[in-house]
Every structure is written in C-alpha cells, then in structure tokens.
C-alpha cells in the first residue's frame, strides 16, 4: 500500500524518469516506512535526519535512524543538528528549525515528508477549532515544492504494519505521548472520542473534507488572482474594480495583494476592515496589518480611489 502511494505520488508530481528525492527521516514509524517505500520507487533517496536536541539521547536516536536509512538502501544519510528557539511555543519553534535545516540540506531535491491521513485529520480538526476560515481547514497539500507528502491517504497503522513486516524498529518519541502538546491531545483524546460517538470513519471524513476544500480553494485563489491583476495599478488596487466583485473573491484578492506587498498573513478582522474601505467607505482611517519593521508599521488605506499599502511611523509607546 505504501509503495503504491509513493509510486502514485511520484507519477503525478514528478513525472518522467525515476527521480531522485530526499526523505525527512525522524526514525519514527511514518518516516521510516516512507523511506522503505521510497528506496524501491525512486531512483535515489537521500535521508535527512534532524536532531532537535530536545531530549537526552536524541543524538543517538538520529545516528540510529541514519544507519537504518543506509541499510534500507538510501544513497546517503545525514544528521542535521539544529538549535530550537522559543518563539511561538516549542512545537512551532521545532518545526521552524526543522524545515529550515531540511531546506538548506536538500541540495535541490524535493523532500518527502511522512505525514499520514491521521496527521491530515488532526490538521483539519485543529484548523476548524481555531475558526480561521476555509484556508485553515484545507489541510496539508500533497506537494508544495519542495515539500512532498505521499502518505496523506495512508493510515498511521499501515506505516507501523510495514515497519513490523520489514523487521524495522521505529523510535517512539516521548513528545508524541505528552499531553502538554495540543496535537497529542487531539490524537489521543479528541479523535478517539469522535470516532466512538460517531461510529468511526471520522479521520477519513476530515481528510476528505480538507481535500475538497483545497480543490475548491485552488479555483477561488485563481479567480482572486485574476481579480487582483485586473485591479492592479502601480502597486495599488483600483477600488472600482474591486467593488463589483463578490465579497469572497475580493477579500482573497486583497489578501494576496497584502502578502505580495510584504505584509504578514492578515486576520479575518483585518481583511473585513480593509474590505469596508472598498464597500462601506465613510472616510475611516487605514487598517494596520502585520509585517512592518522596527519603528514602522504597514497600513492599508483608501486614497484617491485606490487601496494603498504604506509604511507609517509607529506611535511612540507611552
């Protein structure tokens, strides 16, 4: 099943001759099973093992994972040691450090990640609980270069089964059982309860919902990009062009424009306030968005029939 998933992913996203890929290997069952399948289906596989240094003995775990990768037939296996910061919490900081290390070490190759259907279900449920809109419950994409996820249709139980069949001993990360992490509690408490109450099939349904929303979102994003292009005027957006568009497309177009102009991802509240500059103009002031620099902030405003994004000096703290 895993080989079929990897083969299908390679055929869809990297068509042509059998490609070379990198695999992000933690030593856990998911990434270990992915590595085992990839060495059979891809031309060559380089394993990249990230040691976050967050637990005693993590260096030995990383070295053991690299050794397993070589035994499975990887062309190379490298241990990448990173320093995890504290911004945004431990989970987010570790993820940021991991992706940065993988991005630097991949040598131009696509990097396969071991996210499974179960991970996808957790991601969709977490996004739904946070109420951040359809974009947050699309889940993870099968391929956002250079990151590939061939196992999004595979259950976690299947990766464990393959490891057992191959005589592989995956590492059991203590963090994956720690109730201090939100995702762990979703995995061990919330999803099992939903499966029990609703009679099963919840993980598959959540993953399917995420996939459908991602497909729909891709179409809406393309239409919004066309709208933003039509409204573009020397870095600004023409109000008259935006005003006649459906609200959902207009907000998507404004969001894309903000991101392209250097702003951070805007909140729903910020987007709606900016939308009011287009559709409910009463002379109100601009809307501050994230992405400024020390001493400066980014402000979206309405000026002479256009939406503008300007840097303004921050008011001194009192």
Swiss-Prot record:
Pfam families: ATP_bind_3, TilS
GO cellular component terms listed in the entry, alphabetical order: cytoplasm
Entry's Gene Ontology BP terms: tRNA modification
Residues holding ATP: 26-31
Swiss-Prot/TrEMBL catalytic activity: cytidine(34) in tRNA(Ile2) + L-lysine + ATP = lysidine(34) in tRNA(Ile2) + AMP + diphosphate + H(+)
Domain of life per record: Bacteria
Top EC class for this record: ligase
HAMAP family: tRNA_Ile_lys_synt (MF_01161)
Protein name in UniProt: tRNA(Ile)-lysidine synthase
UniProt organism field: Nocardia farcinica (strain IFM 10152)
Lineage, top ranks: Bacteria, Bacillati, Actinomycetota, Actinomycetes, Mycobacteriales
The gene coding this protein: tilS
């Amino acid at each position: 099943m895993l080989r079929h998933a990897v083969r299908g992913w390679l055929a869809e996203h990297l068509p042509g001759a059998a490609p070379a890929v990198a695999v992000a290997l933690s030593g856990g069952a998911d990434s270990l099973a992915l590595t085992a399948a990839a060495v059979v289906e891809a031309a060559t596989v380089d394993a990249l093992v990230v040691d976050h240094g967050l637990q005693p003995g993590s260096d030995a775990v990383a070295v053991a994972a690299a050794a397993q990768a070589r035994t499975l037939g990887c062309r190379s296996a490298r241990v990448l040691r990173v320093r995890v910061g504290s911004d945004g919490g431990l989970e987010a900081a570790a993820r940021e450090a991991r992706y940065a290390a993988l991005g630097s070490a991949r040598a131009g190759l696509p990097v396969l990640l071991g996210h499974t259907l179960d991970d996808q279900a957790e991601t969709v449920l977490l996004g739904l609980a946070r109420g951040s809109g359809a974009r947050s419950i699309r889940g993870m994409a099968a391929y956002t270069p250079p990151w590939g996820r061939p196992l999004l249709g595979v259950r976690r139980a299947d990766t464990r089964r393959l490891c057992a069949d191959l005589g592989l001993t995956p590492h059991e990360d203590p963090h994956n059982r720690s109730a201090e992490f939100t995702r762990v509690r979703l995995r061990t408490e919330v999803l099992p309860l939903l499966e029990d109450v609703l009679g099963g099939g919840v993980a598959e349904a959540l993953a399917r919902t995420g996939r459908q929303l991602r497909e729909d979102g891709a179409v809406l994003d393309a239409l919004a990009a066309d709208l933003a292009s039509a409204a573009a005027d020397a870095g600004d957006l023409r109000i008259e062009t935006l005003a006649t568009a459906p609200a959902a497309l207009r907000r998507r177009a404004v969001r894309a424009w903000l991101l392209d102009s250097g702003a951070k991802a805007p909140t729903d509240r910020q987007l709606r306030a900016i939308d009011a500059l287009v559709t409910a103009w009463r002379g109100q002031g601009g809307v501050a968005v994230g992405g400024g620099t020390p001493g400066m902030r980014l402000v979206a405003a309405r000026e002479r029939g256009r939406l503008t994004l300007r840097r303004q000096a921050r008011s001194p703290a009192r």
